[in-house]
C-alpha cells in the first residue's frame, strides 16, 4: 500500500499526557505509516499507560514499534539481573517498576516483557528512491546495517552524529535535542542526513515530537 504519510514519533518516557497531545494532532489512520522510536517508559508518571498504548497500537499493520535502551534496561532487570540490571532503577526505572508492582500481575508483566523482547531494533524503508532507517539511538559509522551491534543501535551518541557519512536518511531519538543545542526542544536535522527526534519529553519544558518524513511537517505536544 502507498501511504499518504510516513510518521515517526520520538521518545515518550512515561509522559502519556504529552503523547496524547501530539497523537491527537496527527490525524492517524490506516493510510498513515507510523514508526515509534522506543523509550516508552521511565522518568514520567504514566509509564504503564505509555507501554500499554504501544502494545495496542503496534498490533496494527501500519505501525512499527522499535525497542529503546530503556526497554532494554527493563529486560535486563527482569530477565538477567546482575550488573546489567543495576542501571535501570537509577535511570528512571524506579518509577516504571513502582507502577508495574502496583498494577500488574505476573502474567501481565510477562506479556509486557515479551512485547519488549519482540521489538525490532531498526526499520528500513525505501521511498521515492531514498533510503530511510529508523532506529532508537543511531548507527555505528562505516558499518553495514546488517552488521550493526545492539549496543550501538540502542546507546550510541556522539560517534554517530559526528561520524555518520551514509547515504541513507536516519531518523532517531535517544539524544535529547537540548543536549545538542541548549534549550532547543525541537527536532534537529543535521547536515549528514540525520534527524534527531528526542525533544526532551521527560524534561520540564520538553515535548514529544512527530515528523512526516515525506513532507517534513512536524507536530509537537502542548
Residue ranges and their predicted role:
Residues 149-221:
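Conserved beta-sheet core of the metallophosphoesterase superfamily
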Residues 142-148:
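Cytochrome P450 core scaffold surrounding the K-helix E-X-X-R motif
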Residues 13-17, 42-45, 71-75, 141-142, ...:
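Active-site environment of divalent metal-dependent phosphoester hydrolases
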Residues 43-124, 130, 160:
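Active-site neighborhood of divalent metal-dependent phosphoester bond hydrolases
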Residues 1-53:
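N-terminal active-site segment of His-dependent metallophosphoesterases
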Residues 9-10, 34-38, 65-69, 135, ...:
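Active-site neighborhood of phospho(di)ester-bond hydrolases with catalytic His/Asp-centered motifs
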Residues 1-7, 125-132:
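Beta-strand-turn-beta hairpins that frame and shape the catalytic cleft
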Residues 124, 134-136, 210-214:
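Short, well-ordered beta-strand micro-motif
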